[in-house]
Amino acid sequence: MRSKLLFQQKMAALLALLLVLFCTLVRAQTVLSSSLHSEKKYKARMVKRPIKVDGKLKEHDWKQAVLISDFEDIEGASKPKPAFSTNVKMMWDSQYLYIGAVLEEPHLWGTLKKYDDIIYRDHDFEVFIDPMGDGEQYFEIEINVLGTIMDLFMNKPYKKGGTFDLGWNTTGILSKVIANGTINDNSDIDSGWTVEIAIPFKAISRTQRAATPSLLNPWRINFSRVQWTLEPDGKSYRKKLNQNNKPIAEHNWVWNPTGVIDMHLPTKWGYLYFKN
């Protein structure tokens, strides 16, 4: 009788422990899921007046636009918060999607000057757009502090066997970068840089029809900022090397985390709603 009672007590204790472990795992999974799949949303206002793409973002419409300021590490909230702020706004009219970004940056640095250079080898700002919102075909635009652009089209994500088309160009794109400091000069501390981009709707389409905004159906969109660890190099900068004599891995700071170091997961991007 006594041995049976002891057995029952041990089983009860074991079940209680398993219940605690289960609840802990569920809670952790919930937190992780909410941090990685928050599906952030943005409502872009339609503007009636022409916007001058000058990099200043001084128009009244820009001041009225909703601010994105909650960039995170691409892997999610479990990683350290970005060291520098990144603020983004969006607007639209009948022809363009306007994107304005202000990037805090104490060391303005850029080396790539040729169109379609691999811009993420510098500090950069990146835009990913899926106009259909289906997680398939999408477009990528990157720009550095020198105003150099790289753009490409993906027929589908890499994990689905997709390939990139670097020959695709964002025909008619308007862009301007303003450096608030001195580029490639380590003798001072800079404030940052401002990016203003106008993306023609007719450019981000693989058909004769423009990617027309819908007030009902959102697009998928995400923003990324690639940030390298630098060290002085004469009067300029260079990437700091690790113990294996290779550049220290870059930081990837994004609007909507994908959970892994991979931006090419459009189903994990945020939503862009067009507001009239």
Where do the language-model regions lie?
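Bacterial Sec-dependent N-terminal signal peptides
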Residues: 1-34
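Structural preference for beta-rich elements and adjacent junctions enriched in aromatics
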Residues: 29-276
